[in-house]
Amino acid sequence: MAPQFKRPELFGFDKSHAQSFVQGKWISSPNNKTFEVDNPATGEIIGKVADVSVEETKKAISAANEAFKTYKNFTHVQRSQLLERWAELIMENKDDLVKMLTLENGKPLSQAEMEVTTCSGYLKWYAAEAVRTFGDVAPSSLQSQNFLISIKQPVGVSALITPWNFPAAMIARKGGAALAAGCTAIFLPAFRTPYVCLGLVRLAQEAGFPDGVLNVITSSDASAHGKELTTNPIVRKVSFTGSTNVGKILMGQSASTIKKVSMELGGNAPFIVFPDFPIDQAVESFCTIKFNSCGQVCVCPNRVYVHKNVYDEFVSKLTEKVKTIKVGDGFDSSSAVGPLISQDGCKKVSKHIEDAVSKGAKITVGGKEISSSKGYFFEPTVLSGVTQDMLVASEETFGPLASVFKFDDTEEVIEWANDSDVGLAGYVFTNNLSTMIHVAKELEVGLVGANIEMVDEPFISFGGIKQSGFGKEAGRLGVQEFMVVKEINLKTL
């Protein structure tokens, strides 16, 4: 049964199809072209969404540019107040947003509620940061009567390209930073999950943001719109969350106009367990982060490295824990793991399992797609006897697969953990403070969870290194990504 919404108009259900949002108006494609969005838990069609052309993206860029001329001069307090109001409206409409997030993404309601609440948290953080975008003043080293003044200004029109795995949180994490800095924005949400973005932006409109400050382009052809956003000289900033391969394409396109770019790309997170840490606690922490959003999280552990002295115990307890995990529709309150986003996701998990088993790994639980379901469900799976020559060591699975490696000593596991082209998150579990600090420092990642699975909250500056990208979101550095520094040499009379 489809969920009932208190305000169906938030998602365009009051019309024949949901629309894009440009210059304060909800628009359809000129030829009324649409694309369908399905529920990954059932395969059923949720509805139709406007499939607009690149011409609409050009109009959105023009609208954002015109709005920037006014919005950049809003005071820090005005921007802060607008963000606070947006955050309040999100919480007032939380139930509808949570239902839509579960409907189009598939994650359980409890996880969807956490994500929507996090949206509000990001915006409240940025509301506070909006009034803290200070510059600096220093005396000149050459002329005693001179002052060197650094001021921070918004970079300009920003393209914000968001993913399907956290389609609500990324709107707030990127959009809140841009708006706090004084930028205007064009959102390009993933075609699999456009509805929650449309709902959030409608609430931003109700919060009082002027026409043109926020725009949304909906399309089934992200590459065409992405190319326009990255090559149009009016756009001065591109922020993208998604795969490393797509990130490379967008970076190359952005180079044509030398834009400021932030990239939050793929991960291959190591999860390292030393023998002095309580195994039950390590298993609990691992499952909390690994099976969140069915493993479709860029910071979730992809490689589990367990010391040889506790390896068998860890695998045994992890296997028993995974056997208890309920897989099902996100609207079922007993479900802990929902579906993958598409059939392609199921195929990749199967590919990694088949490769590992062919090279000697053993399945201790799970291992199969749940074929009795109409959705894209896969059994939570544990592999033991995993080695560095298997695909799971070098490729991000992005699914409910726990691949457990055995290591002998600290330097060996650090070498294995760093044997990756990407470096977003890593985890280390040990009660030895020296070991913890050493491993945390040596891991080639941008985020480390030390005895904790949490590496993402509004106060943390989120981002990776290597081919996981660059730039920071949230935290003290998030707003700075949308600002430029101007130096003024002032001579007093």
From Swiss-Prot:
Compartment(s): Cytoplasm
Catalyzed reactions per annotation: succinate semialdehyde + NAD(+) + H2O = succinate + NADH + 2 H(+); succinate semialdehyde + NADP(+) + H2O = succinate + NADPH + 2 H(+)
Keywords of the record: Cytoplasm, NADP, Oxidoreductase
Residues the entry annotates as binding NAD(+): 242-247
Residues annotated as the enzyme's active site: 264, 298
One cellular-component annotation, GO: cytosol
SUPFAM superfamilies: ALDH-like
Enzyme Commission (EC) number: 1.2.1.16
One MF term in the entry's GO annotations: succinate-semialdehyde dehydrogenase (NADP+) activity
Task of the protein: Catalyzes the oxidation of succinate semialdehyde to succinate. Can utilize both NAD(+) or NADP(+) as a coenzyme. Functions in the GABA shunt, which allows to bypass 2 reactions in the TCA cycle by removing alpha-ketoglutarate from the cycle and feeding succinate and NADH back into the cycle.
Summary of subunit composition and partner proteins: Homotetramer.
Protein name: Succinate-semialdehyde dehydrogenase [NADP(+)] 2
Organism field: Schizosaccharomyces pombe (strain 972 / ATCC 24843)
Lineage, opening ranks: Eukaryota, Fungi, Dikarya, Ascomycota, Taphrinomycotina
